[in-house]
Amino acid sequence: MKEFEIELSNGIKIPAKLEYGELIYGVTAIAIGKNNNYINNNDVSTLTAKHPITGDNLQIIILDNNNLQNTATLLVPAHIPEHFELAKKYNLPYKQVVAPYFRGTGEQTLRPDIETKFRRSVIAVIKNEKDNTYLCVDSPNRVCKSFVLGGIEEEETPEEAAIREIREETGYTDVTITRKSIFILHNHFYADYKGVNRYSHLYIVFGKINSDTKEEMSEEEKKKQLPKWIKREDLEDFLTVINNKFVNDYLMDGDIAYIGDGIMMNSEEMNGKLRSELKEQ
């Protein structure tokens, strides 16, 4: 537990606490008790609080909680479940500061003698609502069964890249992207099929197929992977890519707060460090 002094936009300074100090840059709002000793609740809509480090304006919400009478709570909706639910109720912003981190194993174990190249990539989770199946690809020449995934070109959004990759890898063209996860995954591995180490930021988008409209796949793509429709209940056994398994386990029905370990991001001097290492300090 870490304590801060928070300045409100009316000049009043109040004490506040943060359950996990390493999440300070993920704070997007502040909660004050209904029976607080600082402000008139009728004025809350006209007030903001100042982030103790960045100086950003934070929304203030009032909760019927006696524990908040003398000390406010800093809210981190992306990483604390109770705060995530408050964010849904009060329309608070989410800011990810811990990225789930995946490191290559087996043939994709990092090669210390090879340079690492950064890449933005996308995981596209596409559903056929008629039979509750999901569009996947199976690579016959290597052990790789996954959702559709691929790199994001410099000028593309994750949504645009997903639609392009779906067309190239499966031939399907009548697809709608319906949502993008608030989370980015980090994947550090040796891309044995490319001969380079990669550090990828993985964006996750979800969508649906509208029809069976397809275009002919190139012969090169046919050799690399085959499209398959997999039932929801069979995805756990089908998927072999660990970060895809994470998506299937946690994000299929909507985002939830990520409470686990990972690489710090959007956190200035803490960026690139493991959360678990910071918690031990």
Kindly give the residue locations of the regions a language model identified.
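NTP-handling and nucleic-acid-processing catalytic cores
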Residues: 1-98
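Short hydrophobic/aromatic beta-strand or adjacent loop that forms the aromatic wall/cage
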Residues: 3, 44, 119-123, 200-204
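Active-site beta-strand termini and strand-to-loop segments that position acidic
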Residues: 7-9, 50-53, 126-129, 139, ...
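Acidic, metal-coordinating catalytic segment for phosphate/diphosphate chemistry
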Residues: 101-125, 129
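Entry beta-strands of beta-propeller and related beta-repeat scaffolds
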Residues: 133-134
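Nudix hydrolase/Nudix homology domain
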Residues: 143-144, 214, 218-281
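A short gly/proline-enriched turn/hairpin at secondary-structure junctions
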Residues: 146-150
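Unchanged
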Residues: 152-179, 184-242
